[in-house]
Design a protein with these regions (language model features):
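Class I SAM-dependent methyltransferase SAM/SAH-binding core
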Residues: 1-27, 31, 45-46
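Conserved catalytic/acceptor-binding region of the Class I
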Residues: 62-130, 138-151
């Protein structure tokens, strides 16, 4: 759905489905948007490097993806329920990169003027089954190679729902789920871009500009 969303804004722009090789022409694009797929990439640095190479000088990269704070409640209740019902643990929610780690990848990929920011939202659901159904409809369920292949026992999710409603309640007898979206931006290096000053080379004091006393 995200590919079609951007197609409404830029119908003539080439669109690439999530895959290891993005197939972008080197140095051919003014803008590359990596929309809500970087958290699934096996090699996120490689994805960013490909995007950087595809940009013209002073071209802009924009990225958005689910961050590490997403689904923290679901991870916790599934962990508790699995220990109680099955006596062990297995990865049931895929790990996602946090803001600091993913922001640092921009510099490694060769982008100038990198910026990383995050947006957190709380969404409520009737129960864990509606939450998991929403994830399934979005194509965001567990695809880890190390996941359990056998169908889990029904009472695992029944127990998880009980824990969820007790531990993370929301208004009107609902449950809450955190969603974090990390946003990245970076520019293809170009001589025309502003450069950071050398440390200690400032000609004016910030305290003077703000009209405050420096301690």
């Amino acid at each position: 759905p995200f590919v079609e969303y951007w197609a409404d804004f830029m119908p003539e722009a080439p669109r690439v489905l999530p895959q290891d090789d993005l197939g972008l022409t080197e140095g051919a694009h003014d803008l590359v948007i990596h929309a809500m797929a970087l958290h699934w990439a096996d090699d996120p640095v490689g994805q960013l490097v490909q995007a950087a190479r595809a940009l013209k000088p002073d071209g802009l990269f924009l990225g958005g993806f689910f961050g590490g704070e997403s689904l923290t409640e679901l991870r916790d209740v599934l962990r508790q329920a699995e220990i109680a019902v099955m006596g062990g643990l297995s990865p049931r929610v895929a790990p996602m990169g946090d803001l600091r780690d993913m922001g640092g990848l921009l510099g490694r990929a060769g982008f100038a003027l990198p910026v990383a920011d995050t947006l957190r939202k709380t969404i409520s659901y009737r129960d864990i089954f509606h939450l998991i159904g929403d994830l399934r409809d979005m194509g965001e369920t567990n695809v880890l190679d190390a996941r359990h292949r056998a169908a889990p026992p029904r009472d695992l999710f029944t127990r998880a729902d009980e824990i969820y409603k007790t531990t993370y309640p929301f208004e009107e007898n609902r449950i809450r789920s955190t969603v974090e979206i990390v946003f990245l931006s970076g520019w293809k290096p170009d001589a025309s871009q502003q450069k950071p000053l050398r440390p200690g080379s400032a000609q004016a004091r910030l305290a003077d500009a703000l009209g405050v006393t420096e301690f």
